[in-house]
């Protein structure tokens, strides 16, 4: 049957009943289930409860557990805020149906087995073979066939209902009721596995309650552990769980359940001490004592009974004598039946070095009994004696207490205990008989070991009569093994020897040989007094014997001594040698044994360390891989979650968009939410394309089938509209005239109203002005006072503002002064830094100038001086090689302040000016070098010097021009003009032998005595000049000044400052104009 998501609840219920009548229960169940899951009807009504009851009945009939679980969770969300009682009704009805069907299945299984047993005919071969192969009885096979499916269904029902109702305060009572029914189910059908799972499920639910106790926005109906009702329900449920575990004899689960009960009691006690009732403690200790007895822990069994007796006594101040006697007798018998050494770790724990684990277990068990320290037998006996347990116990328990704790009669203690035990008849007391016999036998054995050094086996049998030979021998061995007594069985002499054993080849005596006392029995039973009495009697008897036979004994002793002396003298060397040999043999054996033991221990320790290291490395590797895998999975999960959230957001936006409503209607909301956004977009695009094509097709069809009748109707309608328009145009003037008449009448009426109002105002105007003047006169003083107050307030505000402004100006001047001082200090530091860098640069230049430069080769490219590619000029006459001469020395100029310290600005190319294009003044000189000329500096200097020498030698001297005498470009430094040539030969330096050495122009003044001052004087104008000014005229000779100084170590591309003209060539061009 196809699901119907939008069917009304009433119709769905009616439809389901109709389907049930025709035998289609499965279809009816699907119909009801779809109605419960439908999102349209989310308001609870009574019809929903009827639907759920019918749904649960069908689920039980068809064994559809998963549908029942899904429907119950849906119904919980529906009734959580409205009617929780309806949910409880449905759950109870569902469980009753499941329990009834399970009981019916059990009865049916028994009836089928009985039916088979009543047949007169024998078993057929098939049944016999099945019985042999399966190895089970007929009832077991029938239970597996008929009962097992319903048991599984009922167990799933309980578990699902508990999962449904967990951590919900509204249905907490029903939750605990179902839990107790579940325990009854496990006990009735002996479902041990299900009982363990149920206990684990309840523990998990409690952990979740504790985890989410204070978590915000988790569950508004969560169970609160501060509620006494909730704690009481949980405590009662855990006690029933403990009782069920004991009845099913699941002692491990009983112990865990006891821990759960203890935890609940501690939690309740922390919240409110009055929450836990004394009766609960009595029940708890009773069950816990039974668990300890089944576990074989008689020490804690007795401690639990003692705690129960104390609480029972406090709960009933005046309880009857019979009740007190019964409880005290049981406590006393349980305490006396505690064996020796029950509170100490076993031999296995000592040998395996796990005594800490034993102490931890003792502490844990003590916590379960609410004891601050671990109990001991002596402690329990003292506590019992303090509260009067021996006095309140029965006569049998009293007699046993006196025999075992207050009497020293080693030869008849066991017989007396056996005679008393024969009078015990109650079943709850008979369980202690065997333990009491073992305690009495050990007690008698200890007392005998104190008195005798050796005793025959037959006498031991008579002293301890209630054991066989084998059992008695096992008792002696166990007592000696647990170091209760020091005894050895001598089978050759058929006796038992007490005391320490002799030293053997394996080492010294046992550790227990150093212990002289035995668990405090010496002080309790008077052993020390008996020993002293026997020693005194022995001393007196010995003295009496020696007094009666003194002479005879003296002669015998002397004779015996003489014989021993003779024998000693005869065998002394042999005995001495034998003793030494035996001692040496023992020492060697002991050394070898110790060495072997040490080697084994070292080898074992090394092997253990290797195994531990390997295990540790393997564990670290596993943990590392596990962490990496977990991190990868976490990142992948985060990515998947992000992608899922993005898709959900996209689908939600699409769902809100009206464009995608057609897809939602066709696919359904659930299927639409599961779709991929890309798929939705692709499908919507296909739909739009399809609709567009359909629309285009229809339009084309309409164009073909144009309706001419409609066109004719439109033409007629146009004529009608034209007639209506003409009629309205003819009536428009009349309507306008009527509107104007109405408007004029309205204006006239308004004017008359205004005139009337003015007349009324004119009548009272003088009186109004008189009243206003009188009011002003009456309030003249008040007005003047307010004006004076306002003036005073205004003056105060004005003075305050002026004071504030003055203060602000004062602060501003102070801040400006501070900032100016800071700027001055910063500028001073910068100047000092620049000066320091200049000194460093000067030292670097001096160091570099000391080394000569390599002369450039005279190639064709180097002799090409027409770098401006101007028209070819006439070649100069050939020159002869002449040595270079240094120019005249210039006096160092004085320091001119911060202007000399300013760093040179970087070269900036400027557009060509008129002076750049004027080449008239260059008619007698070589063209100047452009900033971007990349030719060799050394070759250019050589060429300029030679050219100037030729010109000075051939041309007559010329007067200095305005460009030579102008000093604006040099900032006040007048260029040095060479004197005119005369016939007198000029003084020149003597020619040096060997190849001519080239001297850079910026070093000539230094060689001539100019020093560093000239270099500094020449570099100042270049640093302070404007970068947009054209180079000075001495650039025509291609001479360069010293390299720049400052932060930038690269050579500057603009021209150097002017230097002295030592060639006599002053030039004839008027260069003053381009320097301005």
UniProtKB/Swiss-Prot annotation:
Keywords: Coiled coil, Cytoplasm, Initiation factor, Protein biosynthesis, RNA-binding
A single MF term (Gene Ontology): mRNA binding
Sequence ranges assigned to domain PCI in this UniProt record: 324-503
GO biological-process terms attached to the record: egg-laying behavior; embryo development ending in birth or egg hatching; formation of cytoplasmic translation initiation complex; translation reinitiation
Chain spans, region Disordered: 600-641, 826-1076
Broad class of the protein's primary localization: cytoplasm
Coiled-coil regions listed: 574-651, 678-713, 776-843
Pfam families noted in UniProt: eIF3a_PCI_TPR-like (PF22591)
Localization, UniProt: Cytoplasm
Composition bias type Basic and acidic residues, residue spans: 608-641, 826-857, 865-908, 929-956, 964-973
Polar residues bias locations: 918-927, 1060-1076
The keyword Cytoplasm is assigned to this record: yes
SMART domains named among the record's database cross-references: PINT (SM00088)
GO cellular component, one term: eukaryotic translation initiation factor 3 complex, eIF3m
InterPro entries according to UniProt: EIF3A, eIF3a_PCI_TPR-like, PCI_dom
Functional note: RNA-binding component of the eukaryotic translation initiation factor 3 (eIF-3) complex, which is involved in protein synthesis of a specialized repertoire of mRNAs and, together with other initiation factors, stimulates binding of mRNA and methionyl-tRNAi to the 40S ribosome. The eIF-3 complex specifically targets and initiates translation of a subset of mRNAs involved in cell proliferation.
Family note: Belongs to the eIF-3 subunit A family.
Subunit structure and binding partners: Component of the eukaryotic translation initiation factor 3 (eIF-3) complex.
Protein name: Eukaryotic translation initiation factor 3 subunit A
Gene name per UniProt: egl-45
């Amino acid at each position: 049957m196809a699901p119907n998501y939008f069917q009304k609840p009433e119709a769905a219920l009616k439809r389901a009943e109709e389907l049930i009548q025709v035998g289609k229960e499965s279809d009816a169940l699907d119909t009801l289930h779809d109605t419960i899951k439908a999102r349209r009807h989310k308001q609870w009504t009574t019809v929903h409860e009827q639907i759920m009851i019918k749904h649960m009945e069908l689920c039980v009939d068809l064994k559809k557990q998963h549908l029942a679980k899904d429907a119950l969770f849906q119904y919980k969300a529906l009734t959580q805020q409205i009617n929780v009682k309806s949910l409880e009704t449905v759950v109870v009805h569902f469980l009753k149906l499941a329990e009834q069907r399970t009981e019916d299945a059990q009865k049916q299984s028994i009836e089928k087995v009985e039916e088979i047993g009543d047949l007169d005919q024998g078993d057929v071969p098939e049944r016999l073979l099945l019985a042999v192969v399966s190895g089970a009885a007929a009832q077991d096979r029938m239970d597996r066939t008929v009962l097992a499916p319903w048991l599984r269904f009922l167990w799933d029902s309980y578990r699902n209902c508990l999962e449904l109702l967990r951590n919900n305060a509204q249905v907490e009572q029903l939750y605990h009721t179902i839990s107790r029914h579940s325990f009854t189910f496990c006990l009735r059908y002996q479902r041990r596995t299900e009982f363990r799972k149920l206990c684990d499920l309840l523990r998990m639910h409690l952990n979740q309650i504790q985890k989410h106790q204070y978590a915000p926005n988790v569950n508004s109906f969560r169970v609160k552990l501060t509620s006494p009702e909730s704690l009481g329900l949980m405590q009662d449920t855990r006690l029933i769980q403990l009782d069920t575990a004991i009845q099913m004899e699941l002692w491990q689960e009983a112990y865990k359940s006891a821990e759960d009960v203890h935890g609940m009691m501690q939690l309740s006690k922390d919240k409110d001490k009055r929450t836990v009732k004394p009766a609960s403690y009595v029940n708890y200790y009773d069950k816990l004592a039974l668990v300890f007895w089944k576990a074989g822990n008689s020490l804690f069994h007795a401690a639990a009974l003692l705690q129960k007796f104390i609480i029972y006594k406090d709960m009933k101040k005046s309880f009857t004598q019979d009740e007190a006697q019964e409880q005290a007798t049981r406590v006393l018998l349980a305490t006396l039946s505690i064996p020796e050494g029950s509170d100490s770790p076993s031999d296995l724990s000592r040998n395996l070095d796990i005594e800490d684990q034993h102490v931890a277990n003792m502490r844990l068990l003590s916590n379960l009994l609410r004891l601050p320290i671990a109990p001991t037998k002596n402690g329990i006996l003292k506590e019992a004696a303090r509260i009067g347990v021996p006095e309140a116990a029965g006569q049998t328990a009293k007699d046993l207490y006196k025999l075992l704790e207050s009497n020293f009669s080693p030869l008849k203690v066991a017989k007396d205990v056996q005679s008393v035990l024969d009078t015990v008849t109650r079943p709850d007391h008979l369980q202690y008989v065997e333990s009491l016999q073992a305690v009495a036998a050990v007690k008698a054995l200890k007392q005998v070991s104190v008195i005798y050094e050796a005793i025959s086996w037959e006498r031991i049998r008579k002293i301890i009569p209630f054991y066989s030979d084998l059992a008695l021998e096992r008792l002696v061995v166990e007592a000696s093994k647990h170091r209760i007594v020091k005894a050895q069985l001598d089978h050759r002499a058929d006796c038992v020897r007490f005391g320490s054993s002799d030293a053997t080849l394996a080492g010294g005596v046992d550790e227990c040989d150093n212990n002289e006392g035995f668990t405090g029995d010496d002080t309790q039973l008077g052993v020390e007094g008996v020993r002293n009495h026997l020693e005194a009697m022995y001393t007196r008897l010995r003295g009496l014997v020696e007094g009666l036979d003194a002479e005879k004994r003296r002669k015998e002793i002397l004779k015996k001594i003489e014989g021993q002396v003779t024998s000693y003298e005869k065998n002394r060397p042999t005995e001495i040698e034998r003793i030494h040999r035996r001692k040496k043999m023992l020492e060697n054996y002991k050394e070898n044994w110790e060495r072997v033991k040490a080697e084994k221990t070292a080898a074992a320790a090394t092997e253990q360390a290797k195994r531990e290291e390997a295990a540790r490395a393997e564990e670290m590797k596993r943990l590392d891989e596990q962490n990496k895998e977990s991190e990868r999975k976490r990142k992948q999960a985060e990515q998947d979650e992000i992608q899922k959230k993005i898709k959900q957001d996209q689908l939600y936006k699409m769902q809100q968009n009206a464009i995608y409503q057609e897809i939602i209607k066709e696919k359904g909301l659930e299927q639409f939410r599961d779709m991929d956004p890309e798929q939705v977009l692709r499908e919507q695009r296909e739909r739009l394309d399809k609709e567009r094509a359909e629309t285009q097709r229809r339009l084309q069809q309409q164009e073909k089938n144009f309706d001419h009748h409609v066109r004719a109707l439109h033409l007629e309608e146009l004529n009608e509209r034209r007639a209506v328009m003409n009629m309205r145009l003819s009536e428009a003037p009349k309507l306008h005239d009527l509107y104007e008449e109405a408007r004029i009448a309205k204006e006239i009426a308004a004017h008359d109203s205004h005139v009337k109002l003015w007349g009324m105002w004119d009548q009272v105007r003088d009186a109004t002005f008189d009243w206003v003047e009188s009011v002003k006169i009456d309030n003249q003083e008040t007005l003047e006072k307010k004006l004076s107050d306002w003036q005073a307030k205004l003056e105060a505000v004005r003075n305050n503002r002026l004071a504030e402004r003055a203060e602000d100006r004062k602060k501003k001047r102070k801040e400006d002064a501070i900032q100016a001082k800071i700027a001055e200090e910063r500028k001073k530091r910068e100047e000092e830094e620049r000066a320091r860098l200049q000194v460093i640069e000067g030292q670097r230049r001096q160091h570099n100038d000391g080394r000569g430069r390599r002369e450039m080769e005279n190639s064709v490219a180097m002799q090409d001086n027409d770098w401006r590619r101007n028209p070819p000029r006439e070649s100069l006459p050939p020159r002869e090689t002449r040595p270079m001469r240094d120019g005249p020395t210039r006096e160092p100029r004085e320091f001119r302040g911060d202007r000399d310290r300013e760093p040179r600005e970087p070269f900036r190319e400027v557009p060509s000016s008129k002076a750049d294009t004027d080449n008239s003044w260059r008619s007698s000189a070589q063209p100047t070098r452009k900033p971007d000329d990349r030719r060799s500096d050394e070759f250019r200097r050589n060429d300029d010097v030679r050219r100037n020498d030729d010109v000075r030698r051939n041309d007559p001297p010329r007067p200095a021009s305005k460009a030579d005498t102008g000093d604006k470009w040099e900032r006040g430094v007048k260029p040095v003009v060479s004197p005119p040539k005369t016939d007198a030969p000029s003084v020149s330096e003597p020619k040096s032998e060997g190849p001519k050495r080239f001297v850079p122009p910026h070093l000539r003044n230094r060689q001539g005595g100019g020093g560093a001052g000239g270099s500094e004087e020449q570099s100042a104008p270049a640093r302070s000049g404007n970068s947009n000014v054209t180079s000075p005229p001495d650039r025509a000779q291609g001479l360069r000044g010293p390299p720049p100084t400052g932060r930038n170590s690269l050579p500057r591309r603009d021209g150097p400052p002017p230097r002295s003209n030592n060639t006599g060539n002053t030039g004839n061009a008027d260069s003053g104009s381009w320097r301005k």
